[in-house]
Amino acid sequence: SRGLGDVYKRQIKNHDVRTEGVSYGMMVAVQLNKKEVFDRIWRWSKKYLQHQEGPREAYFAWSFNPVTMKQNSPGSASDGELYFVTDLLFASNRWGNETGINYYGEARRILDAMWKKDGTGNIFHIINVEHKQISFVPEGNGYTWTDPSYHMPAFMEIWAEYAKDGHEQFYRDCADTARVFLHRACNQETVLNFDYAKFHGTPHST
C-alpha cells in the first residue's frame, strides 16, 4: 500500500487496482467486523479513486496503476459504486458515524451525486432510471445496457431501508426488477448468464 498508511486490493492478473476489488474488500471487512481494514481501504479509495469535482464528482475511477500512482481511466464501472454505497451503509449501522469516518455521510454523498447526474458531460446515474436496472457504466452508450453480475437485489433493499434519501420506492422497484431480470438473463439449464445483456435479458454484443 502507498499513501497515509492506507491499503488497496491489487488485481493480480492485470497489475492494477480496480473498484471491484477495493469495494468487495470493504464488504468482506465490514462483514468480518474488521473496522481498521475497512477504514484504510476506504481512505485509500477516496484519495486515489474518487472524483472530487466535475461531472464525475463522487464517482470512482475504475482502474488505477499502483506503480505510476495514476488513474488508468477516469470512468466508472457501476458495480463499484453499487458496492461502495452498500459497504458504507453497512459500516454506518455496524460502527456508527462518530468513530473517525461519517460512513452514512459518505454513502449519501455518492447517492446524492448520482441523482444529479443527468447526462451532463455524458455522465449518468449508475442505474438506468427508465429501466430501473444498473447500467454497465454510467457513461455514454454504456448507460443503455447492463452486466447481469451487477444485479444485486438485496443491495437495493438495503438502500431502500437505510439510505433515507427519498428514493425508497425506486430502490424497491429496482430490487424487484433485478429478480425478474436474472431469471430472464440466466440459462435455465446451466443457470449461467452472458457477460453483457440488454435490459430485457438477451445477450448484448460488444
What does each of the following model-derived ranges do?
Residues G3-Y8:
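Short, small-residue-biased leader/transition segments that mark boundaries at the very start
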Residues Q11-H15, M26-Q31, Q71-P74, G96-T99, ...:
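Second-shell loop/turn segments in exported
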Residues H15-T19, G54-E57, G75-D79, I101-T206:
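Extended ligand-binding clefts on enzyme/binding-domain cores
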Residues R40-K47, N72, L89-F90, G105-W115:
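Active-site-adjacent structural elements in enzyme catalytic domains
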